[in-house]
């Protein structure tokens, strides 16, 4: 069973690597930019391990799902990513809508997950980042989320979603990844090591499998099911030898 699993995973990884190599070759042979679909954190981890030159962007800083762009002179403007604002027609009669509700409504339209980036819910509106070519289809066909009638329009992300969150200070015994995650999310070390064992922890989009991995300044840590934070820096050591660390939770 588990051997089969490992073989299947290796085959899947191999296919993803090939796809990235093709995009890279096409960009440099033909002299134009090429772009992947949206990548989840595991796919980003595979991409990082290929060391191919590329730029990752998901429509705003710190997006979790990103598109890989290949070729020269790449900036955010060139990525084929659009933001759609989905808002209830009548807020006072609307259900309280969650990320899962918006994602479910899009899946019900038959839209593949890889065409969709992050979905951000704010003030009961959903901001959906998607590939440009699927945007008109979403705008024309997405009429309901749960039992709520909605309207869609292309929009920019609200400014406060584009901005970095405020830094917070945490106390930790060291910069080991299990210690820092436990401090950020108020977990026990035991719970944290289970998350690492279950391959749910990534640093800078690479899978981390060791509890004793030491974090460096500006590392971005993703914990499946909990969210992400940037580990900014060590501020000081207390008299009792504990570290005061600065992090930003996304």
Predicted regions and their residues:
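Electropositive, beta-rich accessory/interaction domains or terminal extensions
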Residues: 7-122
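Helix N-cap motif at beta-to-alpha junctions
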Residues: 130-135
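Short, compositionally biased
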Residues: 229-250
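A common structural junction motif
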Residues: 142-150
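A basic, amphipathic helix-loop patch mediating RNA/tRNA/ribosome contacts
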Residues: 168-217, 233-235
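N-terminal beta-hairpin/loop module of FHA
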Residues: 153-171
